[in-house]
Design a protein with these regions (language model features):
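Conserved beta-loop-beta connector loops within the AMP-binding
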Residues: 312-333, 352, 370-371, 433-439, ...
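Conserved AMP-binding/adenylation subdomain of ANL enzymes
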Residues: 157-174, 182-222, 236-237
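Gly/Ser/Thr-rich phosphate-binding loop
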Residues: 221-225, 235-298, 310
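Conserved pre-ATP/AMP-binding loop-to-beta segment of ANL
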Residues: 14, 121-138, 145, 168-174
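Conserved AMP-binding A3 loop
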Residues: 26-28, 134-158
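AMP-binding/adenylate-forming core of the ANL superfamily
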Residues: 324-340, 359, 365-366
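AMP-binding/adenylate-forming catalytic core of the ANL superfamily
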Residues: 49, 336, 341-342, 365-454, ...
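Conserved AMP-binding/adenylate-forming
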Residues: 23, 38-81, 391, 430
Length: 481
């Protein structure tokens, strides 16, 4: 029996576990296919997984976990330099891939095992300890090469069980999404989550509003997405009443990986009657907070700490903040069973990430409301702007800018200013490129909605904002442009 996935042997074997397009596997079939992989990789140390959005990726990862072997998911879109670094750093014994998948040069030198989604094997007895590594997931290399966060089996189980409590997630739920499978969001939450519950996941292969509507109309109960996906939904809703009706059928709409703009929240709710809930996590911590299914779905917040997660806000000197006033900004630190154990081969970076008493420094800045709801204001390195003696979060200014009818997309950064320390800079994609709003118009708009000291002093007009695979705006690319 698998302690991570008891439904592989203890549930109804005929229930569909995975569906990717027209291909699907029942729990009995998944157990057999993953069992066959497990038999071949047992004792391998670490295995890389070429994480294409296919059945074979899910089978490969589950097979590695059944064998007690850590899986290293690889982004198929990685450049050769980054891929070479990840493979050199993680030293996998072999690479699991779908038959026919073409591997680039850095991976082509590894022993390759093609995953047979119709393989036949037995689910092995689970002998792994909860402290054993489950996954090594590489973080974005914003200040250097990517670091491999080692996620223990304990963290995967703890975060998925906490989300089950918060979201009332059961075996009856059918999840639909089109997320990449080399990140925590798509792989851990989007594939391992349904499998731990004994439910089903339908992967779209590639996100599209028509696919979302089709699956929700065909019995799917939950939708996971990133803000870019929900923005596309919000844009499509006025012309697609069928999409609105389908979304109205969902039990739960969940957004993560970056903040969902309040404007998109409001447009989706107005058209569907549904509210999108947000959660907050990162590679090193898995999930920390969420709006609960039975809680108040408050746009612009990421809810309350999940069961088992301790969360505090601290000053720059590490002093804990006691304020629950919705205004006092501090860095989020977390502690709990959901945390990673180390950065692979990076003891100095691991030590620097934790306080002496075991709190992980997230680098995310937030405020807490009176009832404990957490509102992220941005990253400490890129989103906290110190201007005129104020600590200002970029996120609330971005939301205010998006309320302006002339703004389609917005990002906010700070840049040095001799008088203010830093001045606020807005980067916008105008709704009408022929008539973009100017700095005075946007400054007045923000000052009226927030406060004068939060108004942008500089505005840049762009055709698009740079984003990564998960839809996050790459602010360092803006600042360096």
């Amino acid at each position: 029996m698998s302690l991570l996935f008891p439904a592989l042997t203890g549930g109804p074997g005929e229930r569909v576990a995975l569906r990717f397009g027209e291909r699907s596997l029942t729990y009995a079939e998944l157990g057999a296919a993953a069992g066959a992989v497990a038999a071949r990789v047992r004792g391998a140390g670490r295995v890389a997984v070429w994480a294409t959005p296919e059945l074979e990726t899910a089978v490969g990862v589950v097979g590695a976990l059944l064998a007690g072997v850590a899986a290293v998911p690889l982004n198929p879109k990685s450049g050769e330099g980054e891929l070479a670094h990840i493979l050199s750093d993680s030293s996998p014994s072999l690479v699991l891939a779908a038959p026919g998948a073409r591997l680039p040069a850095p991976a082509a030198g590894l022993v390759r095992l093609d995953v047979d989604a119709r393989g036949r094997g037995d689910v092995p007895e689970d002998r792994a300890a909860d402290t054993d590594p489950a996954l090594v997931v590489y973080t974005s290399g914003t200040t250097g090469p990517p670091k491999g966060a080692v996620l223990p089996r304990r963290a995967v189980a703890a975060t998925l069980d906490a989300l089950a409590d918060a979201w009332r997630w059961t075996a009856d739920d059918v999840l639909v999404h089109g997320l990449p499978l080399f990140h925590v969001h798509g792989l851990v939450l989007g594939v391992l989550g349904p499998l731990r519950r004994g439910g089903s996941v339908r992967h779209l292969g590639r996100f599209g509003t028509q696919g979302v509507a089709r699956e929700l109309n065909d019995g799917a109960t939950m939708l996971f997405g990133v803000p870019t996906m929900y923005h596309r939904i919000a844009e499509a809703l006025p012309e697609d009443p069928g999409l609105a009706k389908a979304l109205g059928r969902a039990r739960l709409l969940v957004s993560g990986s970056a903040a969902l703009p309040v404007h998109d929240h409001e447009r989706i709710t107005a058209a569907t009657g549904q509210r999108v809930i947000e959660r907050y996590g990162m590679t090193e911590t898995l999930m920390n907070t969420s709006v609960r299914a039975d809680g108040e779905p408050r746009a612009g917040t990421v809810g309350v700490p999940l069961p088992g997660v301790e969360l505090r806000l601290v000053e720059e000197d590490g002093t804990a903040l006691a304020a629950y006033d919705g205004e006092t900004v501090g860095e989020i630190e977390v502690r709990g069973p959901n945390l990673f154990t180390e950065y692979l081969n990076r003891p100095d970076a691991t030590a620097a990430a934790f306080t002496a008493d075991g709190w992980f420094r997230t680098g995310d800045m937030a405020v807490r409301e009176a009832d404990g709801y957490v509102r992220i204001v941005g990253r400490k390195a890129t989103d906290l702007i110190k201007s005129g003696g104020y600590k200002i979060g970029a996120g609330e200014i971005e939301n205010a800018l998006l309320e302006h009818p002339g703004v389609r997309e917005a990002a906010v950064t700070g840049e040095p200013d001799a008088d203010l320390g830093e001045r606020i800079v807005a980067w916008i994609v105008p709704a009408d490129p022929q008539s973009p709003p100017g700095v005075e118009e946007l400054a007045e708009h923000v000052a009226r909605r927030l406060a004068p000291h939060k108004r942008p002093r500089v505005v840049h007009h762009l055709t698009a904002l740079p984003r990564n695979d998960m839809g996050k705006i790459m602010k360092r690319a803006l600042s360096n442009s």
